[in-house]
Swiss-Prot record:
Source species, domain of life: Bacteria
Organismal lineage: Bacteria, Pseudomonadati, Pseudomonadota, Gammaproteobacteria, Enterobacterales
GO molecular function: acid-thiol ligase activity; carnitine-CoA ligase activity; crotonobetaine-CoA ligase activity
EC category: ligase
Pathway(s) of this molecule: Amine and polyamine metabolism; carnitine metabolism
Role noted for this protein: Catalyzes the transfer of CoA to carnitine, generating the initial carnitinyl-CoA needed for the CaiB reaction cycle. Also has activity toward crotonobetaine and gamma-butyrobetaine.
Protein name per UniProt: Crotonobetaine/carnitine--CoA ligase
Organism the protein comes from: Proteus sp. (strain LE138)
UniProt KW Amino-acid biosynthesis keyword: no
Similarity comment: Belongs to the ATP-dependent AMP-binding enzyme family.
UniProtKB keywords: Ligase
Catalytic activity as recorded in UniProt: 4-(trimethylamino)butanoate + ATP + CoA = 4-(trimethylamino)butanoyl-CoA + AMP + diphosphate; crotonobetaine + ATP + CoA = crotonobetainyl-CoA + AMP + diphosphate; (R)-carnitine + ATP + CoA = (R)-carnitinyl-CoA + AMP + diphosphate
Gene that this sequence comes from: caiC
Keyword Cell cycle tagged: no
Length: 518
């Protein structure tokens, strides 16, 4: 059975506009509190205007167009507008500076960029660099633009185009819709090639996983350039005719008030959001929400999980995946049995195994690499852009993907995440998980944030170093820190060194960028 058939993203939006028409599709709140709202038909019209503008400016099927934007409705106009004419969106992390952005532009040979005033200084020099492939800049601005070759005023020019699509490029669900670069926390990012089929199946899969309904209001503050916002929030919500509330920025002080304000029924969070929300003063109405599920990503310590559930009266729904899997293919479902700290079980379309370094399946309870099986270009990514070597290493011909995550499986088929392979420390013959140590250290009442890495050790392969951020106003001596560790973990897991810091470098999804600590 094929639930997608030939329905690419253009057909999806035309159908959504017809079926849901005036129902609210997107509510956007800026960092200043300004709210913009679009019905399904209005959003489709803006998508068509953007598509017409891009086509009029010479963008054709297969062209790579970079988007460097904070969360905003224009991201959605461009994302789906490009898809409607067969062009390929290349979202760029909004935190990236010149060198990081230029590397992606050069690597994928993007001739076009859509950006805002905030980021235009990154791209203006590229327009005049004869070695850069960039030839045209679409600038989202409320300022009057001076006439400059290669710069297009996106808002004013888009408004000149009709709300119906002018050009219907032949499309296939197998066409590339997006190249999404991985975070590159330990190495240069790789371009994950994502098809129309990938994005359509993400909508169906994640809406099934969350049991989404037409009357749901899904609030997200995850970056639109990230796979979570796209494939765990937006597309699932749209696949059932629900409403997306997109916030421009995360604010610990405002986040729970926004959940109450918009009467959100589903939201998603990373541990940093949960921790900072829990640090806010208790509000008498904070339990008067309508949240049915909170999608939870990455690792949350037991004490944090229990405290959040008790205080906020929420239910956490675990979802585990990566950009290459498109969705959180291992996870919990509403109403199903849950077994914390399990990350859940694989859903339909997928299989999962634990394998050793010889690529052989291991018995239940034994830690190894989590490998998952799907179909390339459909339920898994198609390939790494211009990296056949990396594709061959990660993706086997029969559809098994090596995730680089370590974990184990229990007798009932529940999977447990241990750590990323790059976060496993080899110490005196023992494999030590950074996350395990981090969770223990995070349980100290004076510690707000922590990261652990391995550092070279001539005798024991690697030593363990901890980077610790204290709760505001608290103090903790090195002696007290080591005493706590010695009391709460095996001797070989106790860090050899600690460094106290004001903050930790994190990427958009909350992962610590550990290469910046080494």
């Amino acid at each position: 059975m094929d639930v997608i058939g030939r329905q690419h993203l253009r057909q999806m939006w035309d159908d959504l506009a017809e079926v849901y028409d005036k129902k609210t599709a997107l509510i956007f709140e800026s960092a200043q509190g300004k709210v913009r709202q679009f019905s399904y038909s209005e959003l489709n019209e803006e998508i068509n205007r953007a598509a017409n503008l891009f086509h009029a400016c010479g963008i054709k099927k297969g062209d790579h167009v970079a988007l460097h934007l904070d969360n905003c409705p224009e991201f959605f106009f461009c994302w789906f507008g490009l898809a409607k004419i067969g062009a390929v969106m290349v979202p760029i992390n909004a935190r990236f500076m010149y060198e990081e952005s230029a590397w992606i532009i050069n690597h994928c040979q993007a001739h076009f960029v859509v950006t805002s005033d905030n980021f235009s200084p990154i791209y203006q020099p590229m327009l005049h660099d004869k070695h850069s492939p960039l030839t045209q800049l679409f600038l989202i601005t409320e300022n009057c633009l001076p006439t400059e070759q290669g710069v297009v005023d996106f808002l004013s020019e888009k408004a000149k185009h009709p709300v119906t699509l002018n050009h219907h490029t032949p499309l296939s669900v197998d066409d590339t819709a997006e190249i999404l670069f991985t975070s590159g926390t330990t190495s240069q990012p790789k371009g994950v090639v994502i098809t129309h089929y990938n994005l359509r199946i993400a909508g169906y899969y994640s809406s099934w996983q969350n049991a989404l309904r037409e009357d749901d209001i899904y609030l997200t503050v995850m970056p639109a350039f990230h796979i979570d916002c796209q494939c765990t929030a937006s597309l699932p919500a749209y696949s059932v005719g629900a409403t997306i509330v997109l916030l421009e920025k995360y604010s610990a002080r405002a986040s729970w008030k926004q959940i109450l304000k918009y009467q959100a029924t589903v939201t998603e969070c990373i541990p940093m959001m949960m921790r900072t929300s829990m640090a806010q003063p208790v509000s008498p109405d904070e339990k008067q929400h309508k949240l049915r599920e909170v999608m939870s990503y990455l690792n949350l310590a037991d004490k944090e999980k229990d405290a959040s559930i008790e205080r906020l009266n929420v239910r956490l729904l675990t979802s585990h995946g990566m950009t290459e899997t498109i969705v959180g293919l291992i996870g919990d479902r509403p109403g199903d049995k849950r077994r914390w700290p399990s990350i859940g079980r694989p859903g339909f379309c997928y299989q999962a195994q634990i394998r050793d370094k010889q690529n052989q399946q291991v018995p239940n309870g034994v830690v190894g690499e989590i490998c998952v099986k799907g179909e390339a270009g459909k339920t898994l990514f198609k390939e790494y852009y211009n990296r056949p070597d990396a594709t061959e290493k990660a993706l086997e011909p029969d559809g098994w993907l090596h995730t680089g995550d370590y974990g184990y499986r229990d007798d009932e088929g529940f999977f447990y995440f241990v750590d990323r392979s790059c976060n496993m420390i080899k110490r005196g013959g023992e494999n030590v998980s950074c996350i395990e140590i981090e969770n223990i250290i995070a349980s100290h009442p004076k510690i707000q944030d922590v990261a652990v890495i391995g550092v070279p050790d001539d005798i024991r392969d690697e030593a363990i170093k901890a980077f610790v951020v204290l709760v505001d106003g608290e103090t903790l001596s090195e002696e007290a820190f080591f005493a706590f560790c010695e009391q709460n973990m095996a001797k070989f897991k106790v860090p050899s060194a600690v460094e106290f810091k004001q903050g930790l470098p994190r990427n958009c999804s909350g992962k610590v960028i550990k290469k910046h600590l080494q």
